[in-house]
Amino acid sequence: MMDALLKAGYRPEIERAVQQCLASQDLADHETGAVTAEAAAEHGSATAVEDGKRFRLFELSANCIDLNDRQVEVLLAMRQPNVVLFGNLLCDWECDALIESSRPKLTPSRVVNADKGTYELKRDVRTSSGAFFQRGETPLVAAIESRLSRLLGVAESRGEPLQILHYPPGAEYRPHYDFFDPARPGNQRVLSMGGQRVGTLIIYLNDVKAGGSTVFPKIGLDILPKKGCGLFFSYADDAGGLDYQTLHGGSPVVAGEKWIATKWLRLGDYLARSD
């Protein structure tokens, strides 16, 4: 596994984080901290999190996935939480084109207010800027969304708009969960747009000089940004409950800047509301 990471261009420093993560795997299997399917059902989320089992890509036996337009490498796969690191997901010019096309559209990033269901600025939590591309908005976006659909086996209609995020020096995203707590009243609005989120794919669009890793603090794993690579994780544990080990964040950029593309997947077809 480490040979594959090094071949893909990852620095040797990542070995320590990966080995620490793997060493703690047995403990994590027994002490997940995740809610059970029965507990999730009390809030109407059992069906949503059970769907996450479909994304357990660690079951793939191949180290390389043929998507017709390119060969995508599997560099790292974890069972619980379900985390997969892909190499060669995007080529350099695709990464560069996404960055340049997003620049005129960038606005300060917002977070969902779980009590009101509104999107609000919260600079003490998230200090990036971002831009959204609707499904098929450009030929490049359409080609990338088609590739991601083939990779994950998920219909394009279940994906939220592709989001491009820019993190200048010092910018970060504090640890958080991507799924919505159905017990919070404001989340009913966002859940009505396609159901629960079941998976996240982060694509690194540039190499970062220092900092800017994707960190999973509960399992001691840092993924360092590498241009063209993609990080996928889903939120269901083996029992079909929400896996709280998927707590993650974007560590502060120390030097240089960080660009990523994010695709969130829903239980059903995603349809944004206009109100």
What are these regions (language model features)?
Residues D3-F232, A236-D275:
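Fe(II)/2-oxoglutarate oxygenase catalytic core
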